[in-house]
A protein has these predicted regions:
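Generic secondary-structure boundary/loop-capping signal
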Residues: 37, 62, 122-124, 130, ...
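Metal-dependent nucleotidyltransferase catalytic core
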Residues: 1-19, 27-40, 46-106
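Conserved nucleotidyltransferase catalytic core and NTase-mimicking acidic/glycine-rich helix/loop elements
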Residues: 143-287
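Short amphipathic alpha-helical segments, especially helix-boundary/capping motifs
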Residues: 7-10, 57, 138-144, 227-228
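Conserved NTP/Mg2+-binding pocket subregion across the NTase superfamily
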Residues: 64-173, 178, 183, 189
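Short loop/turn and capping residues at structural boundaries
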Residues: 26-27, 181
Length: 287
Protein backbone atom coordinates (compact mmCIF):
# COMPACT_ATOMS: atom_id res chain seq x y z
CA UNK A 1 0.00 0.00 0.00
CA UNK A 2 1.34 3.40 -0.97
CA UNK A 3 1.75 5.81 1.94
CA UNK A 4 0.78 9.46 2.26
CA UNK A 5 4.46 10.33 2.63
CA UNK A 6 5.28 8.60 -0.67
CA UNK A 7 2.46 10.37 -2.52
CA UNK A 8 3.41 13.71 -1.01
CA UNK A 9 7.03 13.25 -2.03
CA UNK A 10 6.13 12.18 -5.57
CA UNK A 11 3.63 15.02 -5.94
CA UNK A 12 6.09 17.63 -4.66
CA UNK A 13 8.81 16.51 -7.07
CA UNK A 14 6.32 16.54 -9.95
CA UNK A 15 4.97 19.97 -9.02
CA UNK A 16 8.44 21.48 -8.60
CA UNK A 17 9.39 20.26 -12.07
CA UNK A 18 6.10 21.39 -13.65
CA UNK A 19 6.24 25.11 -14.43
CA UNK A 20 2.44 25.22 -14.75
CA UNK A 21 2.02 24.45 -11.03
CA UNK A 22 2.85 27.58 -9.04
CA UNK A 23 2.02 26.69 -5.45
CA UNK A 24 0.67 23.89 -3.27
CA UNK A 25 0.14 23.26 0.40
CA UNK A 26 -1.32 20.61 2.70
CA UNK A 27 -4.28 21.24 5.02
CA UNK A 28 -6.18 18.96 7.38
CA UNK A 29 -4.86 16.43 9.84
CA UNK A 30 -1.58 15.94 7.98
CA UNK A 31 -0.75 19.61 8.59
CA UNK A 32 -2.21 19.98 12.09
CA UNK A 33 -0.35 20.02 15.39
CA UNK A 34 -3.51 19.54 17.46
CA UNK A 35 -5.04 16.12 16.74
CA UNK A 36 -2.57 15.23 13.97
CA UNK A 37 -3.07 12.49 11.40
CA UNK A 38 -3.58 8.87 12.34
CA UNK A 39 -2.98 5.82 10.15
CA UNK A 40 -6.32 6.30 8.36
CA UNK A 41 -6.06 10.01 7.58
CA UNK A 42 -6.34 11.23 4.03
CA UNK A 43 -4.00 13.77 2.42
CA UNK A 44 -5.51 17.12 1.44
CA UNK A 45 -3.58 19.19 -1.10
CA UNK A 46 -4.55 22.67 -2.28
CA UNK A 47 -2.82 23.51 -5.56
CA UNK A 48 -2.58 26.61 -7.75
CA UNK A 49 -1.85 26.23 -11.45
CA UNK A 50 -1.95 28.31 -14.61
CA UNK A 51 -4.28 25.77 -16.21
CA UNK A 52 -6.13 24.55 -13.12
CA UNK A 53 -9.02 23.18 -15.18
CA UNK A 54 -6.77 20.67 -16.90
CA UNK A 55 -5.85 19.00 -13.63
CA UNK A 56 -9.48 18.85 -12.60
CA UNK A 57 -10.60 17.39 -15.92
CA UNK A 58 -7.84 14.79 -16.46
CA UNK A 59 -6.24 12.07 -14.37
CA UNK A 60 -3.15 11.10 -16.37
CA UNK A 61 -0.99 13.21 -14.06
CA UNK A 62 -2.41 11.44 -10.99
CA UNK A 63 -1.61 8.00 -12.39
CA UNK A 64 2.07 8.93 -12.40
CA UNK A 65 2.19 8.93 -8.59
CA UNK A 66 1.01 5.37 -7.79
CA UNK A 67 -1.43 2.67 -8.95
CA UNK A 68 -4.86 4.27 -9.03
CA UNK A 69 -8.26 2.86 -8.10
CA UNK A 70 -10.64 5.82 -8.26
CA UNK A 71 -10.46 9.54 -9.12
CA UNK A 72 -13.81 11.27 -8.68
CA UNK A 73 -14.27 14.77 -10.08
CA UNK A 74 -16.47 17.06 -8.02
CA UNK A 75 -16.61 20.28 -6.06
CA UNK A 76 -16.00 21.15 -2.45
CA UNK A 77 -18.73 22.51 -0.18
CA UNK A 78 -17.43 25.96 -1.13
CA UNK A 79 -17.72 25.25 -4.85
CA UNK A 80 -14.03 24.75 -5.66
CA UNK A 81 -13.13 22.01 -8.19
CA UNK A 82 -11.62 18.91 -6.62
CA UNK A 83 -10.57 15.32 -7.27
CA UNK A 84 -11.22 12.68 -4.63
CA UNK A 85 -8.57 10.07 -5.31
CA UNK A 86 -8.24 6.54 -3.96
CA UNK A 87 -4.90 4.89 -4.61
CA UNK A 88 -4.44 1.12 -4.60
CA UNK A 89 -4.43 -0.09 -1.02
CA UNK A 90 -6.88 2.53 0.25
CA UNK A 91 -5.00 5.82 0.68
CA UNK A 92 -7.28 8.78 -0.06
CA UNK A 93 -5.86 12.02 -1.44
CA UNK A 94 -8.06 15.06 -2.08
CA UNK A 95 -6.79 17.61 -4.59
CA UNK A 96 -8.43 21.06 -4.71
CA UNK A 97 -7.61 23.24 -7.70
CA UNK A 98 -7.27 27.02 -7.97
CA UNK A 99 -6.02 29.19 -10.84
CA UNK A 100 -2.67 30.78 -10.12
CA UNK A 101 -4.28 34.21 -10.41
CA UNK A 102 -5.79 33.60 -6.95
CA UNK A 103 -2.33 33.80 -5.43
CA UNK A 104 -2.20 37.56 -5.95
CA UNK A 105 -5.16 38.00 -3.61
CA UNK A 106 -3.86 35.64 -0.93
CA UNK A 107 -2.13 38.30 1.22
CA UNK A 108 -5.31 40.36 1.45
CA UNK A 109 -7.37 37.25 2.14
CA UNK A 110 -5.05 36.31 5.01
CA UNK A 111 -4.99 39.84 6.40
CA UNK A 112 -8.73 40.53 6.41
CA UNK A 113 -10.05 37.20 7.76
CA UNK A 114 -11.78 35.46 9.32
CA UNK A 115 -9.90 32.49 7.94
CA UNK A 116 -11.38 29.01 7.39
CA UNK A 117 -10.78 26.69 10.32
CA UNK A 118 -8.66 24.29 8.26
CA UNK A 119 -6.25 27.13 7.44
CA UNK A 120 -6.09 28.29 11.05
CA UNK A 121 -5.46 24.78 12.39
CA UNK A 122 -2.37 24.35 10.24
CA UNK A 123 -0.88 24.25 6.76
CA UNK A 124 2.30 22.78 5.33
CA UNK A 125 3.83 24.29 2.20
CA UNK A 126 4.95 21.93 -0.57
CA UNK A 127 5.58 24.35 -3.45
CA UNK A 128 5.86 28.14 -3.41
CA UNK A 129 7.25 29.44 -6.70
CA UNK A 130 5.63 32.85 -6.25
CA UNK A 131 6.89 33.32 -2.70
CA UNK A 132 3.48 34.07 -1.17
CA UNK A 133 2.72 30.99 0.94
CA UNK A 134 5.19 32.06 3.61
CA UNK A 135 2.42 34.40 4.75
CA UNK A 136 0.20 31.49 5.80
CA UNK A 137 -0.33 31.64 9.57
CA UNK A 138 1.33 29.21 11.99
CA UNK A 139 -0.91 26.46 13.38
CA UNK A 140 -3.42 27.76 15.90
CA UNK A 141 -6.88 27.33 17.34
CA UNK A 142 -9.89 28.90 15.64
CA UNK A 143 -11.81 31.55 17.50
CA UNK A 144 -14.73 30.20 19.50
CA UNK A 145 -18.02 30.43 17.58
CA UNK A 146 -20.29 33.32 18.40
CA UNK A 147 -23.16 32.35 20.73
CA UNK A 148 -26.58 32.33 19.07
CA UNK A 149 -28.73 35.43 19.29
CA UNK A 150 -32.45 35.18 19.98
CA UNK A 151 -33.45 34.80 16.33
CA UNK A 152 -30.80 32.18 15.55
CA UNK A 153 -31.67 30.21 18.66
CA UNK A 154 -35.39 30.23 17.87
CA UNK A 155 -34.76 29.16 14.28
CA UNK A 156 -32.67 26.23 15.46
CA UNK A 157 -35.37 25.14 17.91
CA UNK A 158 -38.07 25.31 15.27
CA UNK A 159 -35.91 23.35 12.83
CA UNK A 160 -35.40 20.54 15.32
CA UNK A 161 -39.03 20.26 16.37
CA UNK A 162 -40.23 20.46 12.76
CA UNK A 163 -37.89 17.56 11.94
CA UNK A 164 -39.21 15.62 14.95
CA UNK A 165 -42.78 15.69 13.66
CA UNK A 166 -41.68 14.75 10.15
CA UNK A 167 -39.55 11.84 11.40
CA UNK A 168 -42.39 10.61 13.63
CA UNK A 169 -44.70 10.38 10.61
CA UNK A 170 -42.19 8.25 8.70
CA UNK A 171 -41.82 6.00 11.71
CA UNK A 172 -45.59 5.67 12.15
CA UNK A 173 -45.90 4.56 8.51
CA UNK A 174 -43.22 1.94 9.07
CA UNK A 175 -41.05 3.63 6.45
CA UNK A 176 -37.85 2.91 8.31
CA UNK A 177 -35.36 4.03 5.68
CA UNK A 178 -37.12 7.38 5.14
CA UNK A 179 -37.29 7.61 8.93
CA UNK A 180 -33.51 7.33 9.13
CA UNK A 181 -33.16 10.03 6.47
CA UNK A 182 -35.63 12.27 8.28
CA UNK A 183 -33.77 11.69 11.54
CA UNK A 184 -30.76 13.58 10.18
CA UNK A 185 -32.68 16.81 10.70
CA UNK A 186 -32.93 15.96 14.38
CA UNK A 187 -29.40 14.65 14.90
CA UNK A 188 -27.88 17.58 13.00
CA UNK A 189 -29.85 20.02 15.11
CA UNK A 190 -28.88 18.13 18.25
CA UNK A 191 -25.18 18.33 17.37
CA UNK A 192 -25.49 22.08 16.93
CA UNK A 193 -27.11 22.35 20.35
CA UNK A 194 -24.38 20.19 21.91
CA UNK A 195 -21.82 22.65 20.54
CA UNK A 196 -23.72 25.72 21.77
CA UNK A 197 -24.11 24.03 25.14
CA UNK A 198 -20.37 23.31 25.38
CA UNK A 199 -19.52 26.92 24.60
CA UNK A 200 -22.23 28.51 26.73
CA UNK A 201 -21.34 26.53 29.84
CA UNK A 202 -17.60 27.12 29.43
CA UNK A 203 -17.89 30.87 29.11
CA UNK A 204 -16.92 30.72 25.46
CA UNK A 205 -13.67 28.81 26.04
CA UNK A 206 -14.46 26.01 23.60
CA UNK A 207 -13.29 24.32 20.43
CA UNK A 208 -16.13 22.31 18.92
CA UNK A 209 -14.44 21.34 15.64
CA UNK A 210 -16.67 20.46 12.67
CA UNK A 211 -19.21 17.78 11.87
CA UNK A 212 -18.98 16.09 15.26
CA UNK A 213 -15.22 15.43 15.14
CA UNK A 214 -13.83 14.72 18.60
CA UNK A 215 -17.24 15.33 20.18
CA UNK A 216 -16.37 12.89 22.96
CA UNK A 217 -13.66 15.36 24.01
CA UNK A 218 -15.41 18.71 23.72
CA UNK A 219 -18.99 17.95 24.77
CA UNK A 220 -19.74 18.85 28.37
CA UNK A 221 -19.32 16.14 30.98
CA UNK A 222 -22.01 13.48 30.66
CA UNK A 223 -23.39 14.72 27.35
CA UNK A 224 -21.44 12.27 25.20
CA UNK A 225 -22.79 9.37 27.25
CA UNK A 226 -26.31 10.71 26.69
CA UNK A 227 -25.69 10.80 22.93
CA UNK A 228 -25.26 7.03 22.83
CA UNK A 229 -28.99 6.49 22.47
CA UNK A 230 -29.84 8.97 19.71
CA UNK A 231 -29.41 6.58 16.77
CA UNK A 232 -31.67 3.64 16.08
CA UNK A 233 -31.77 0.33 14.27
CA UNK A 234 -34.20 -0.29 11.42
CA UNK A 235 -36.95 -1.22 13.88
CA UNK A 236 -40.08 0.67 14.80
CA UNK A 237 -39.73 0.17 18.54
CA UNK A 238 -36.09 1.16 18.55
CA UNK A 239 -37.03 4.17 16.45
CA UNK A 240 -39.51 5.25 19.12
CA UNK A 241 -36.85 4.84 21.78
CA UNK A 242 -34.32 6.94 19.83
CA UNK A 243 -36.90 9.65 19.16
CA UNK A 244 -37.60 10.01 22.88
CA UNK A 245 -33.90 10.13 23.71
CA UNK A 246 -33.29 12.85 21.10
CA UNK A 247 -36.19 14.99 22.22
CA UNK A 248 -35.37 14.73 25.92
CA UNK A 249 -31.69 15.48 25.44
CA UNK A 250 -32.34 18.36 23.05
CA UNK A 251 -34.84 19.88 25.44
CA UNK A 252 -32.46 19.69 28.38
CA UNK A 253 -29.48 21.14 26.52
CA UNK A 254 -31.52 23.88 24.85
CA UNK A 255 -33.03 24.97 28.15
CA UNK A 256 -29.58 25.14 29.74
CA UNK A 257 -28.27 27.19 26.80
CA UNK A 258 -31.25 29.53 27.05
CA UNK A 259 -30.69 30.02 30.77
CA UNK A 260 -26.97 30.63 30.36
CA UNK A 261 -27.36 33.10 27.47
CA UNK A 262 -30.53 34.76 28.78
CA UNK A 263 -32.62 33.68 25.80
CA UNK A 264 -36.35 33.02 25.85
CA UNK A 265 -37.46 29.40 25.55
CA UNK A 266 -40.74 28.36 23.85
CA UNK A 267 -41.87 25.89 26.50
CA UNK A 268 -45.46 25.71 25.28
CA UNK A 269 -44.41 25.01 21.69
CA UNK A 270 -42.10 22.23 22.84
CA UNK A 271 -44.83 20.65 24.96
CA UNK A 272 -47.34 20.76 22.11
CA UNK A 273 -44.96 19.23 19.60
CA UNK A 274 -43.70 16.58 22.01
CA UNK A 275 -47.28 15.53 22.72
CA UNK A 276 -48.03 15.43 18.99
CA UNK A 277 -44.98 13.29 18.29
CA UNK A 278 -46.01 10.85 21.01
CA UNK A 279 -49.54 10.60 19.61
CA UNK A 280 -48.21 9.93 16.13
CA UNK A 281 -45.73 7.29 17.29
CA UNK A 282 -48.33 5.58 19.48
CA UNK A 283 -50.83 5.47 16.62
CA UNK A 284 -53.35 7.78 18.30
CA UNK A 285 -53.32 10.22 15.36
CA UNK A 286 -54.74 8.88 12.13
CA UNK A 287 -52.80 9.47 8.91
Amino acid sequence: MVTAEEIESAYTAWAQANDDVRAAFVVGSRARVDHPADAWADLDIIMFARDADRYHETIDWIRAFAPLWIALAGRTAGGDPERLVLFAGGLQVDFVFHPDTHLAGLPQFLATGPLPDDIVRGTRVLVDKEGVLAQLPPPGRPSAPQPPDSATFRQALEGFWFAAVYAAKQLRRGELWPFQNASSGMTGGLLQMVAWHACALSGGDCDTWHGGKFVAEWAREGVYADLQGVFSRLEVEDGRRAMRVRMALYSRLAREVAAELDLSYPTELEQQITATVERIMDGKDKA
